[in-house]
Amino acid sequence: MWREKGNAIGNWLLAITAIFGFITLIWIPQASAECQTRSIYCYECDSWTDARCKDPFNYTALPRDQPPLMTCNGCCVKMVRHQRSRYEVVRRMCTSQLQINLFMVDHVCMMESSGNGHMCFCEEDMCNSSKDLYSHGHQLHLIITIAVAVSWLMGQLLNR
C-alpha cells in the first residue's frame, strides 16, 4: 500500500514538473523575444519638466495635449520616485534608453526597498500611461492558475 502511494505521489510530482517545464520553455522565450523585436509606441516624458507626465495620466486628452510618443524597439518603462508625496516624480520612457537585460524585466514591476518608488515594464503601445502597470502582467497569474488546475486534475486521474 505504501509503495502504491509513493508511486502515485512520484507520478504526480513528475507531472507537475513536466507541466511547469513545458510552460517555461514556451512562455518565457516568447515573451522576451516579443519585447525585443517588435516596435511599439511609448510615452517619453519627465514630470519635473512636463506636468502632463504626472499621475493620474490624462490618456483621453487630445494628442497635442499629451506627452510625446516615441517608437521603441524594446519595452515601455514607467518609473516613480517619492510615490504619493508632493515630491513625486514620474518618468516614462523606452528600455532602449536603459542598460538593462530585457529577459529579466518583461512584465515586471520592481519596488524600491524603501517602498517609496517603483519601476515597471510593459510591451503594448502606450502602456506606460497606466497609473498601475501591474494590470499588464496578468499572463503569469493565468499560467500558474492553469498549471495548478491541470496538476490537480492529473493527480485525480492518477489516484483512480
From Swiss-Prot:
Residues the record marks as carrying a glycan: N58
Function: Bifunctional regulator of neuronal activity in the mushroom body, and possibly other regions of the brain, that acts as a signaling molecule required for homeostatic regulation of sleep under normal conditions and after sleep deprivation. Reduces neuronal excitability by enhancing Sh/shaker K(+) channel activity; possibly by stabilizing Sh/shaker to increase protein levels, accelerating its activation kinetics, slowing C-type inactivation and enhancing recovery from inactivation. Specifically affects the A-type K(+) current.
InterPro entries cross-referenced by the UniProt entry: QVR-like (IPR031424), Sleep_regulator (IPR050975)
Region described as Loop 1: spans on this chain: 55-68
Designated name of the protein: UPAR/Ly6 domain-containing protein qvr
Post-translational modification note: N-glycosylated probably on Asn-58.
Pfam name, any one: QVR
GO BP, one annotated term: regulation of synaptic transmission, cholinergic
Keywords: Biological rhythms, Cell membrane, Disulfide bond, Glycoprotein, GPI-anchor, Lipoprotein, Membrane, Signal, Transmembrane, Transmembrane helix
Complexes and interactors: Interacts (via loop 2 of the three-fingered Ly-6 domain) with Sh/shaker; this interaction may stabilize both components of the complex and may be required for targeting or retention of Sh/shaker to neural cell projections. Interacts (via loop 2 of the three-fingered Ly-6 domain) with nAChRalpha3 and potentially other nicotinic acetylcholine receptors; this interaction is required for antagonism of nicotinic acetylcholine receptors.
Region Loop 2: start-end pairs: 78-92
Coiled coil start-end: none
CDD domains xref list: TFP_LU_ECD_Qvr
Domain statement: Consists of a single Ly-6 domain, adopting a three finger fold stabilized by 5 disulfide bonds. The first loop contains a region essential for protein folding or that is required for localization to the cell surface. The second loop mediates protein-protein interactions.
GO cellular component: membrane raft; plasma membrane; side of membrane
Tissues where the protein occurs: Expressed in mushroom body (at protein level); overlaps with expression of Sh/shaker and nicotinic acetylcholine receptor (nAChR) components also involved in sleep regulation. Expressed in the adult brain and head. Enriched in the mushroom body, anterior optic tubercle, superior protocerebrum, antennal nerve and visual projection neuron fibers projecting into the lobula plate of the optic lobe.
UniProt entry tagged with the keyword Signal: yes
Membrane spanning residue stretches: 138-158
Signal peptide residues on this chain, from the entry's feature table: 1-33
Superkingdom in the source lineage: Eukaryota
Lipid-linked residues (GPI-anchor amidated asparagine): N128
